[in-house]
Amino acid sequence: MKFFIDTADIEEIRAANELKILDGVTTNPTLIAKTGKPFMDVVKEILAEVPDKPVSLEVASTDYEGMIREGEMLAQLGKNVVIKIPMTIDGLKAVKYFEYNGIKTNVTLIFSPAQALLAMKAGASYISPFVGRLDDISHTGMELISQIKTIIDNYGFSSQIIVASIRNPMHVLEAALIGAHISTIPYKVIAQLVKHPLTDLGIERFLKDWESVPEKPF
């Protein structure tokens, strides 16, 4: 499974990149707004940090012409830019346009297997089903991931699943067990994946025992 980080915070991206496990970045208007910085400043910082990894940048328009205009502008910022497009009728048309012209797309805000199927039929490079938001309304987000994976296995679609709206380490583990291609993870959840209470206890015990070793070389 590939690990993307879901943030526009350059410090979080750098920290994740230093772990040598980062495979890409996803952003959205909300995450960029949280930085309090101008849009282009944020984007250029991110692209400079991960020039060889896919970075999803979302269009702000909801109409076809606007999506094309904004997507083409964003695509010029780097070869690793992926145009993030909402799951709408106009969005599907835009996906077809971009993919035909060699620009990768990520269809976002997917909440049903039917939406995922349409996005894959349109040729999306990536599809982003939101598990946490489904869990919030008493649906089972991971069931959606399993259904999408089955559709891909049945028909051989090339689209990759980006499990989005991840809230906790279990979401990542469940996505991996299902066979999703990618999880896009907030930095705080990446940090949580590292930790286990028995690991902490083991380190504490080893350090205590080490103190009793005579003539330590270091």
From Swiss-Prot:
Coiled-coil intervals: none
EC number: 2.2.1.2
Pfam families noted in UniProt: TAL_FSA
Enzyme class, first EC level, given as a word: transferase
Superkingdom assignment: Bacteria
Catalyzed reactions per annotation: D-sedoheptulose 7-phosphate + D-glyceraldehyde 3-phosphate = D-erythrose 4-phosphate + beta-D-fructose 6-phosphate
Record key words, sorted: Cytoplasm, Pentose shunt, Schiff base, Transferase
SUPFAM superfamilies given in the database record: Aldolase
GO cellular component terms, A-Z: cytoplasm
Single GO MF annotation: aldehyde-lyase activity
Catalytic residues as annotated in Swiss-Prot or TrEMBL: K84
Pathway: Carbohydrate degradation; pentose phosphate pathway; D-glyceraldehyde 3-phosphate and beta-D-fructose 6-phosphate from D-ribose 5-phosphate and D-xylulose 5-phosphate (non-oxidative stage): step 2/3
Family: Belongs to the transaldolase family. Type 3B subfamily.
NCBIfam families with a match to the protein in the record: fsa_talC_mipB
PANTHER family, per database record: FRUCTOSE-6-PHOSPHATE ALDOLASE 1-RELATED, TRANSALDOLASE
UniProt-listed HAMAP family: Transaldolase_3b
UniProt-recorded name of the protein: Probable transaldolase
Gene it is expressed from: tal
